[in-house]
Amino acid sequence: MLLLLSLVACGAEAQVRTRGIDVSKFQGTINWTKVAKDSTIRFVYIKATEGTSIQDPRYKANVAGARKAGLLVGSYHLYSSKTTAYQQFGNFKKMVKKKEQDLVPVLDIEGHHSGRLYMARVDKLLELMEAEYGVRPMIYTSERVYKTHFAGKKYAKYHFFIANYRRTPSVRYTLWQYTETGHVSGIRGYVDINRFHRKHSLSDIRMPRPKKKKSATEGEK
């Protein structure tokens, strides 16, 4: 019994200590080797695109550097209410290669969109991303936007990445962006830092492993 309790406690501690960051061009040139030396930093979400045509100039270097350092990598698209889902998906697809992704893609919907989100457009973009990458995207947003647009059963199967810098989110979430003024070795200035809800872990947002193709002789006796 004592051993079981010890294992449970160790698992809970490991989950609490698993953190991730999200970065863009605003973090400048990152020393990913130094970032990876922090044993609690296991993953990173990297900005790829925004709207129809904006592509983060540090994206490719950040993906390559983070992966080389041994961090799990995911990519995010900053949603714009001014252009179509197809245009935004085309921009994201050009930049984000499935084979370079360890984590599910993220659709970033900022708080200022709350009153004019155009939900049909959001739904279509989520649909296109899922078809391309083979997994439901995670949705990043604020509690206010979640309560206004995503609280219903329609989005119950999606993982949510919620920003709240004052307190633990009061809505359903998988990832919590708990600070925008974090400090991590290897990054000059502030960086967003994220951690999991106690019921979730990295396994919940990992990309599915590709299915192995059966050989011509497999199954033969």
What are these regions (language model features)?
Residues 1-8:
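Bacterial N-terminal signal peptides
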Residues 15-30, 36, 46-126, 130-132:
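Substrate-binding cleft of extracellular glycoside hydrolase catalytic domains
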Residues 16-23, 153-221:
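Functionally critical loop-and-helix segments that line ligand-binding/catalytic clefts
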Residues 30-31, 148:
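Short acidic active-site motifs
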Residues 103-167:
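Catalytic domains of cell-wall/extracellular-matrix polysaccharide-remodeling enzymes
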